Curated annotation (Swiss-Prot):
Membership in a protein family: Belongs to the LeuD family. LeuD type 1 subfamily.
Keywords: Amino-acid biosynthesis, Branched-chain amino acid biosynthesis, Leucine biosynthesis, Lyase
EC numbers on record: 4.2.1.33
Complex formation: Heterodimer of LeuC and LeuD.
Keyword Nuclease among record annotations: no
Enzyme class, spelled out: lyase
Pathway noted in the entry: Amino-acid biosynthesis; L-leucine biosynthesis; L-leucine from 3-methyl-2-oxobutanoate: step 2/4
Official protein name in the record: 3-isopropylmalate dehydratase small subunit
Cross-referenced SUPFAM superfamilies: LeuD/IlvD-like
Function (record text): Catalyzes the isomerization between 2-isopropylmalate and 3-isopropylmalate, via the formation of 2-isopropylmaleate.
Pfam families per UniProt: Aconitase_C (PF00694)
Catalytic reactions on record: (2R,3S)-3-isopropylmalate = (2S)-2-isopropylmalate
Gene: leuD
Length: 213
């Protein structure tokens, strides 16, 4: 998992509430358990004018010019700004995979669906909860200023605007530790590999019948 420390990046606005996981990555693309390759189909039904299916050459598909993420000014964005209850619907882990593969490192919203929120942390994506008032202000600033960037410092738990205004966000110490060090659940387990191996060797000696066959 990629570590998250600090970024300064373009913000892309998605001015919609209750964006569900089927909108983030439609069900027809959930045929792989690899974490990569989902970016070209993120927001597929909004992003393209035709109906997408696995195996299509996305570079030849007609883009929807009215979809905000297709606008040239938001290309290369690594921060997604959106509205309340983002990531609702099914619990598919492909949703944060698709956002990560698209290039997003952080998502800012007034609220997130619980399962999606937890899945973000497991996949190196930082979900930031801000008040609706602050999110409203950010939408206005992003839309009024082309190339608008925010700076996120995870260690300090701060978000800084181009004008220098800084505000904080909440995150548990455990989740912050994992993101700062690029540790998913497997990585956390492997930190204790020596202890696990010692335990197994001790058990092999005391209960050898468990290891026969």
């Amino acid at each position: 998992m990629k570590a998250f420390t600090k970024i300064t990046a373009i913000v892309a606005p998605l001015d919609r509430s209750n964006v569900d996981t089927d909108a983030i990555i439609p069900k027809q693309f959930l045929k792989s358990i690899k974490r990569s390759g989902f970016g070209p189909n993120a927001f597929d039904e909004w992003r393209y004018l035709d109906h997408g299916e696995p195996g299509m050459d996305n570079s030849k598909r007609p883009l929807n010019p009215d979809f905000s993420l297709n606008q040239p000014r938001y290309q290369g964005a690594q921060i997604l700004l959106t509205r309340k209850n983002f990531g609702c619907g099914s619990s598919r882990e492909h949703a944060p995979w698709a956002l990560d593969d698209y290039g997003f490192r952080a998502v800012i919203a007034p609220s997130f669906a619980d399962i999606f929120f937890n899945n973000c942390y497991k996949n190196g994506l930082l979900p930031i909860v801000l008040t609706e008032e602050r999110v409203d202000r950010l939408f206005k600033e992003v839309e009024a200023n082309e190339g608008y960037q925010l700076s996120i410092d995870l260690a300090e738990q701060t978000l800084t605007t181009p004008s220098g205004e800084t505000f904080t966000f909440d995150i548990t110490e455990h989740r912050k530790h994992c993101l700062l060090n690029g540790l998913d659940e497997i990585g956390l387990t492997l930190q204790h590999a020596d202890e696990i191996h010692a335990f197994e060797e001790k058990r092999r000696q005391s209960q050898p019948w468990l290891f026969n066959g």
